[in-house]
Amino acid sequence: MGQDERPADNRRQVFLDRRIKRIDMTPFVLASASPARKRLLQQAGIDPIVHPSDFDESQVQLTAPAELVSVLAEQKALATMRSLWEKRGDLQLVGYGRLFSRTPGLILGCDSVLSLNGEIYGKPNDAAAAIARWKQMRGQVGELYTGHALLVPYSEQGVLMPSAALVRAQMTRVFFAEISDRQIEAYVATGEPLFCAGCFALEGRGSLFVEKIEGCHTNVIGLSMPLLRQMLAEVEVDVIDFWQK
């Protein structure tokens, strides 16, 4: 529902010192293996290169959900940036090389969690955990947070740096239905909630068990498209230019 920015002293904000002039030659890298995030981008006319991050999320222990997803999103984007840089010699044939040419590319990292009754939840570990989670969630109001980190990597004399690093968090309130044990068990048996931070997929069968939401619906799916448009504008990229690639 609301948009949170990490405190200035905690967020690395480097002002853009170079401009992306030819978006048709600019690769957009998604530092996530999420099919839902990839699908959202493609539906909006952005065809991303998927290069998931290998960042170890257990390194980050924070209790504020907006700060947690922001830090994780940024670290995932940075890890992917470093990985691409290390492999750049092998990436020319598939187009990644453009990331580190004189035309900078874009790397998007994301992370989502559900906050419910003061607790923060990621993906459930197994079916038993998912069933227990849903028994807590039913009839309750949760807050789904997604962190977004947009990096513009640039190389200068062999040194890699982000010439812009934008980090934002978005929150959407989710009103869960009062559903039966039988419905919970049947839903978990589909396997769908096991792959979702909120233990449900708004774009799938989970939509049956959500009464309403307050805020950005794509944020619940894993990526706030309106927020992404705003972040791209901050680095002087008009999202519609991707349609011409």
What feature does the model see in each segment?
Residues 25-28, 66-245:
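Anionic-ligand binding patches
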